[in-house]
Amino acid sequence: FRKLYGIDDGSPSHYALSSVDFSSLAKAYGRVGGLDRVATVVNAIRADRPDALLLDGGDTWHGSYTCYHTEGQDMVNVMNMLKPDAMTFHWEFTLGSDRVAEIVEGLPFAALGQNIFDAEWDEPAELFPPYKFFERGGVKIAVIGQAFPYMPIANPGWMFPEYSFGIRDENMQAMVDEVRAQGAECVVCLSHNGFDVDKSMASKVTGIDVILSGHTHDALPEPVLVGDTIVVASGSNGKFVSRVDLDIQNGRMMGF
């Protein structure tokens, strides 16, 4: 892995992206990650590119002692201060459907999931729009949300009986076609599928420019190209911020 990406011994990338020599490197580099440091990076990017989009791939309102005791409110408060433009979901649903609805209804940003369906009627859940448009840098961008597809298998279904999930490649294709028909010049899939599932989706669904991949905690220093789609794996636990600069010309992604 380190040879493939040209990662030097003892470098920050060696520490952040590899478990080899972790103990000795930890003594040199110390604590990594945390939303305070994420905020520092995000603020620096926004100062450089005020038109940047900030997207959150989920697993955000769960996983810590304070999160458990506040039903996710501590993380909701921090993320509201960070001001992302959109998010999608996985472990958030283990707060229970009512609590998720309570939080989502008060969010100042988009809560997206093209594959979150009403379990009784097998139609898209009204609380979670499939996509949202953004105008940035003179480009019309569509962000399509993709929540974790295997929710009732990986987590207790009684916590969210109102919803069904699944990969729903065909519906994703329909959403891509829909936003393209509405003038989207760039299509971003904000996904919690997992890296391998996202690569598979990229090979099946046409018209997606970028997949921001979550769930499997993979952290890669470069995007992976699948056909005409780049797949970006951004790690986990607040240790990484992935910055993707795109060259969009005449409604097409020409480079990154």
Regions found by a protein language model. Give the residues of each.
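Acidic, metal/ion-coordinating pockets
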Residues: 1-256
